[in-house]
């Protein structure tokens, strides 16, 4: 109960976070199922190989939502909802409540259920987002461009959209990864408003990419799990007290990130190659 009250008290924090629209304008939603089974390439493109040079053709896309198309493996999700999320641009709203009009694919029948995050893939118009948040979006765009050009990751977190009212606790399994219409980065992460154990309920795979012209930003949030992690973050690891866990959080995160980096990509569910293949197939029209 103490942790719940603490969490509730932090909901007023004005850190940029969950991009939850406060507008009364409803999103336009279209629902569809995956009707074609097309083999996914066994190996996704790597950071050192441009997508067109891998020699392994991507499957034909079987999922389209507005300007975005991709190949959705039926083994990963059985269907999807396509929606156009309306703009939320109240200048008096916190940054995590501000967004341009954008396209979202929400996966249904996903291989993992009852996770903190819903599996989604979003496409944001960069110019309008930058107009709405001029002190935030250009900085994130520059950071993403530096990483895709081969720059170091540093230790202050990786560029990420949507904006959350929580902090990026860690990242692991980082890689530069091209997609059909651009380039980006993928990594595992977890967000929280307090020192929270990394766990299978909250951890997710994310892809953050951009088109070469800088017009669109692609963001994917896809839950994952690994046998190394606990089911949830209700208790600190190894029987510690919360005070002890908080005091040693930096050491804990560094050690856990190293352990996750050492796990085989196929040990995750869904596997990292399966998720890489999904985001690599994204095409922006």
Where are the language model's segments positioned?
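Signature of long, low-cysteine stretches enriched in small and polar/charged residues
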Residues: 151-215, 221-230
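N-terminal Sec/ER secretory leader and immediately downstream segment
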Residues: 59-166
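Low-complexity, polar-biased intrinsically disordered regions enriched in Pro/Ser/Thr/Gly
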Residues: 86-97, 156, 194-202, 228-245
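Surface-exposed amphipathic alpha-helical segments
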Residues: 63, 67-68, 222-285
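Residues that cap or initiate secondary-structure elements
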Residues: 24, 111, 129, 193, ...
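Polar/charged alpha-helical tracts
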Residues: 49-52, 57-59, 78, 92, ...
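Intrinsically disordered, low-complexity Ser/Thr/Pro-rich tracts
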Residues: 1-102, 184, 280-285
């Amino acid at each position: 109960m103490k942790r719940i009250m603490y969490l509730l008290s932090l909901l007023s924090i004005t850190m940029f976070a969950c991009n939850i629209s406060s507008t009364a304008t409803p999103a336009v939603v279209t629902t569809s199922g995956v009707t074609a089974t097309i083999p996914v390439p066994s190996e996704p493109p790597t950071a050192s190989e441009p997508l067109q040079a891998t020699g392994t053709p991507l499957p034909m896309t079987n999922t389209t939502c507005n300007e975005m198309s991709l190949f959705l493996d039926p083994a990963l999700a059985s269907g999807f909802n396509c929606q156009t999320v309306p703009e939320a641009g109240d200048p008096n709203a916190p940054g995590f409540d501000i967004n341009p009009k954008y396209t979202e694919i929400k996966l249904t029948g996903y291989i993992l259920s009852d996770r903190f995050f819903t599996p989604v893939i979003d496409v944001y118009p960069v110019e309008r987002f930058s107009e709405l948040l001029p002190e935030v979006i250009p900085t994130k765009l520059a950071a993403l461009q530096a990483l895709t050009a081969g720059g170091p990751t540093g230790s202050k977190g990786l560029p990420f959209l949507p904006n959350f009212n929580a902090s990026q606790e860690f990242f692991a399994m980082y890689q530069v990864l091209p997609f059909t219409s651009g380039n980006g980065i993928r990594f595992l992460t977890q967000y929280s408003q307090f020192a929270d154990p990394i766990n299978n309920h909250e951890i997710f795979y994310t892809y953050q990419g951009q088109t070469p012209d800088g017009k669109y930003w692609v963001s994917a949030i896809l839950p994952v799990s690994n046998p190394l992690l606990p089911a949830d973050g209700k208790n600190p690891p190894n029987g510690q007290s919360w005070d002890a866990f908080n005091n040693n959080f930096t050491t804990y995160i560094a050690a856990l990130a190293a352990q996750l980096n050492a796990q085989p990509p196929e040990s995750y569910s869904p596997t990292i190659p399966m998720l890489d293949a999904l985001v690599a197939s994204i095409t922006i029209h």
